[in-house]
Amino acid sequence: MRRIGAITALSLPVLLSLLYSCGTGGSASKEEILSKKEHNPEPNIPLECYTDTGVVKLGKAIANPCYVCHTKALTPYENEVDDFDLQLVYDFPEEIKEMGNPWLNAIKPELTIGSVPMPSDEEIKTWIRQDNWSKAYAEKGKGELVYFPDIPPIYKYENGSYELINVDKEGFVRDPETGEYTGWRVFKWKPFPGFFPTNGRIDSTFIRLPEKFRKKNGEFDLNLYKKNLAILECAMKGVAPGETCSGTEVGDFIMPFRYEGDASDVEVVVYQYPPGTEFAHPLYYLDPENTLSFKSLRIKEMRYMKKLAYADTRTGTGEEEEEEGTFFWDKGRFFNDSGYWEMRAFIEDKNGYLRPQSPEESKFCIACHGGIGGTVDGTFTLWRKIPGEEGWKEQDYKNIKDYRYKAITCENLDSLEMGEEVKKALEAYCSKVGESPGEYTVYFALTAGGDHFRSNYEILQDISVDGKVDLELLYNPEKIKFIDNSGFIKPELFFPEPERAYGIDKQYYRIVKAQAFIYGRDVFEKAFGISSGGNSLEELDNLESTGVKESGIWNFVKNFLSSE
């Protein structure tokens, strides 16, 4: 019998029937439907999608965090979809409507992790400074870790301090034994709105192109590899063959129609990674003592993607549902919904060692990489890379500008597809500043906070001079506090205070010890459901409109960023 804390083999349906059976009516029919599934039937719908915009608690929407993911498709390929309608309606499957919000770690954590004691400060510091990456790296290709990626750890912790290892000054990852180039390269990108360390999201991102992209006449050529990476970066940012690719580490050049060197047989396709492109994506705990990046030695997860083929252009809506029973899984290896990416995912076991994610846990990854409007080729990263040499280094959350949306300029506001309240606020901003606002400025204003859940009160003091965050940020841009006099985002925006950082670590540690990932990976200081005073929806059966259309805060523009 599987145990989650002191709860003996209680499946998600049973837990939810207990939660929602008192005074709600219809509990028998819910239980009948839920008994058909052991756990969450739709783990690919993340907790963010269960956020109350205000329409439930206040009777009207005051926030629209949905627009950053669900919008006009950024590209014409099958990897993305026009799903902007999901800003307007809560479109949950019937089974989810019947069962209610399945992410119990957010709304009822006492049922899932309540029996796991909160670790002390010293216990959590000891935990996060232990190395579980090296062990997994040493065992790659064997047993349960047969698909673990061949990328070595990049930090060590000795004598009370952190040091970056196995990464050179240009971001190339070196073999820890031979010092040779592995092909992996770390890069820095503007974090996706809300996915900040202060919200519990901290990571590194690595890319590797196939061997022939690194060779000329069969010999390794570092300068050639840099050029091919620059070509790819510009292609992902929308620069077509024949146009000028500018601001790269190798200078400005005319975009070729094919990659160079031994990869000259591979066509350059705008908005598409060439087949064989790999990504590695470790997720960390927060450690304020790491002054390099705030990242812990221990990693929570290792995620991996490999491109299989160039994607076809969309011919339908792109939202056709995957047939039941077609999900492939083998020791943490699986494929995203479009089938153009192989994915792998590893997460901590209760002792902190990395193990393959289960099929249900793996489907959680497809939530964001399975085909939404706000990605490019199913990813969030390289098209958001910091330009030039500054972008080829480990993510340190420094020297990042609040790059603007290409689609929003002061000259084209009348033609944009967005609500009247948003448009009026942007007009006010333009009239005062003379240029359109940055991406984060728009996000904070539309989200009425610094995260999708409106749960992080600490960040509000870093965003605004008076701690109030809403559309007034656009009407009164002098309230903006998170940008310095040189136009860069102040690093303190991204980081929580040490006490809160370790508090986030502690709550996640409890999920690890309970092995309760199927109930969610986001952590809050206390239960965050509507009934507990939070903003996570609980019951869904009578919910339709998000209210953002009625409140005039919808936004259907593509979220590509400018480089200025």
UniProtKB/Swiss-Prot annotation:
Predominant location: membrane
Coiled coil: none
Highest taxon listed in the record's lineage: Bacteria
Membrane topology (UniProt): Lipid-anchor
PROSITE patterns xrefs: PROKAR_LIPOPROTEIN
Signal peptide positions (record): 1-21
Cellular compartments annotated: Cell membrane
Lipidation (S-diacylglycerol cysteine): C22
Keywords: Cell membrane, Lipoprotein, Membrane, Palmitate, Signal
GO cellular component terms attached to this protein's record: plasma membrane
Residues with a covalently attached lipid (N-palmitoyl cysteine): C22
Official protein name in the record: Uncharacterized lipoprotein aq_1262
Species of provenance: Aquifex aeolicus (strain VF5)
Lineage, highest ranks first: Bacteria, Pseudomonadati, Aquificota, Aquificia, Aquificales
